[in-house]
Amino acid sequence: MIGKLKGTIDEIGEDYVLVDVQGVCYVAYCSARTLSKLGSAGEACVLFIETYVREDQLKLFGFMTALEREWFNLLQSVQGVGAKVALAVLSTLTPGELANAIALQDRAAVSRAPGVGPKVAMRLVTELKNRAPAYAGEAINIALKRELGEGVAAAPVADAVSALTNLGYSRDQAANAVAAAMKTAGEGADSAKLIRLGLKELAR
């Protein structure tokens, strides 16, 4: 099994990169986000690889980080999500944004990915709620998860985060602001109050 490729970029296509490793070229299918972070032909390239072996084909999927690869596999554990849809989700959301969307039960954020309809979005946020990669950093917004806790009604929180992102803030900024707002407002606060308090946090 191939776990990582280190070589030079030979060609970048619409959904793949051709990596030259000592004269042998490998095709690795990637998310649009990963492809956008790669350099140009002739530049060095390092990709974490997930190898798919089927009876009639062998495919390599490439990722900038091991975390992105972990999310790729986790997404496919949900019914209706294959490699194509998993890459579409990772093209639309960063690992951190995806973790926040799941913690917030924010189906709308997940539904922005091509190929993800309402039913699949519901399954993603529901089934993966307690299965996100269990380490901090970009993938997990610790403050937000602490404020939500288990069993907290997430709809007002998701609405507040969505409203703040519509105002131009990043999803991580919005999530942090709403998490701070929940400390002040408490679990029973409606979305309007969370938005007001969140804006105050962002204005500081």
Curated annotation (Swiss-Prot):
Subcellular location: Cytoplasm
Annotated stretches, region: Domain III: 152-204
InterPro entries attached to this UniProt entry: DNA_helicase_Holl-junc_RuvA_I (IPR013849), NA-bd_OB-fold (IPR012340), RuvA (IPR000085), RuvA_2-like (IPR010994), RuvA_C (IPR011114), RuvA_C_sf (IPR036267)
Region (Flexible linker): 144-151
Gene Ontology biological-process entries: DNA recombination; DNA repair
Superkingdom of the organism of origin: Bacteria
Keyword ATP-binding: no
Cysteine pairs bridged by disulfides in the record: none
One GO MF term: ATP binding
Spans annotated as Domain II: 65-143
A GO-annotated cellular component: Holliday junction helicase complex
UniProt keyword annotation of DNA-binding present: yes
Principal place of residence: cytoplasm
Keywords: Cytoplasm, DNA damage, DNA recombination, DNA repair, DNA-binding
Annotated TM spans: none
Domain notes: Has three domains with a flexible linker between the domains II and III and assumes an 'L' shape. Domain III is highly mobile and contacts RuvB.
Annotated NCBIfam families: ruvA
Subunit structure: Homotetramer. Forms an RuvA(8)-RuvB(12)-Holliday junction (HJ) complex. HJ DNA is sandwiched between 2 RuvA tetramers; dsDNA enters through RuvA and exits via RuvB. An RuvB hexamer assembles on each DNA strand where it exits the tetramer. Each RuvB hexamer is contacted by two RuvA subunits (via domain III) on 2 adjacent RuvB subunits; this complex drives branch migration. In the full resolvosome a probable DNA-RuvA(4)-RuvB(12)-RuvC(2) complex forms which resolves the HJ.
Purpose: The RuvA-RuvB-RuvC complex processes Holliday junction (HJ) DNA during genetic recombination and DNA repair, while the RuvA-RuvB complex plays an important role in the rescue of blocked DNA replication forks via replication fork reversal (RFR). RuvA specifically binds to HJ cruciform DNA, conferring on it an open structure. The RuvB hexamer acts as an ATP-dependent pump, pulling dsDNA into and through the RuvAB complex. HJ branch migration allows RuvC to scan DNA until it finds its consensus sequence, where it cleaves and resolves the cruciform DNA.
Family statement: Belongs to the RuvA family.
Name listed for the protein in its UniProt record: Holliday junction branch migration complex subunit RuvA
Organism expressing this protein natively: Rhizobium etli (strain ATCC 51251 / DSM 11541 / JCM 21823 / NBRC 15573 / CFN 42)
Gene: ruvA
